[in-house]
Amino acid sequence: NGVTEEVGWEFKRLNCNNIMIITDENLIDHISVTKTIKSIEQNNLNPILFSEVSVEPTDSSFKKAIEFAVTNNINGFVGVGGGSSMDTAKAANLYSTYPADFMTYVNAPIGKGTPVPGKLKPMIAIPTTTGTGSETTGTAVFDYEEMNAKTAIAHRELRPLIGLIDPENVRTIPPNVVACSGLDVLCHGLESYTAIPFHTRNKPETPSLRPSYQGSNPISDIWSLTAVKMVAKNIYNAVNDPDNHEARSQMLLAVTYAGIGFGNAGCHLCHGMS
């Protein structure tokens, strides 16, 4: 509990000074954001707030964040919120570090699918929902408006350097959100466990072309199955008893476990249909 308070220390250790805090307008006064700002200031660093994250990010909303990062000479990123905030932070980090036409890094066949050239600037993820697991993945999902299609940018270098998993940030989530996001966690675990096995896929021409999602494998299976068991044990109490902090803490941990699982193995039918 309370690990959000360490975010400023982490950025100072990483030699960052201009820190872009990416969140949405509904979280500006939430404890997760106020603690993040305070911690950065206490470490004599410069917090720069960007609160224009879209609930469902689009290429346009990503471009706003990218322009903001470039204009403000950002050298450290922290995504505070759900998957939308964290994915927006990944995109802002990528394109401000390696500027390119927007479609360059977008997954083929919609985009060019060009591999990320190298390391990005330090990014820390602070999740405030018990759902997406974006703090563990190298994927930034968005709606491509021109085609009315959901796609993503996916590469291992997009993974946040640090995830601060703080139960205090999920204590006030409405029960219906805990329920819906909890089913997302369940799908992450089940889909990654039943994904096409890694050994049935063709070897890429070079390691740089290896996809972010490898298929089910013995290591991701451990994380995925553990997450499913944690959801089964805790989701009822997390939804129906908001004061059951242990149940909500376990759901938040399950999110991260499932994220490590599907962040390596990938998802399939449910997420593909959505």
PLM regions: where:
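N-terminal amphipathic/basic leader segments beginning at the initiator methionine
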Residues: 1-14
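A glycine/threonine-rich phosphate-anchoring loop and its flanking beta-alpha core
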Residues: 98-212
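Conserved beta-strand elements of the Class I
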Residues: 20-21, 76-78, 124
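Predominant activation on well-ordered alpha-helical scaffold segments within soluble catalytic domains
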Residues: 8, 37, 48, 63-66, ...
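N-terminal small/polar loop signature for handling phosphorylated ligands or for N-terminal nucleophile
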Residues: 28-102, 236-248
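Active-site segments that bind and position negatively charged phosphate/pyrophosphate groups
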Residues: 198-274
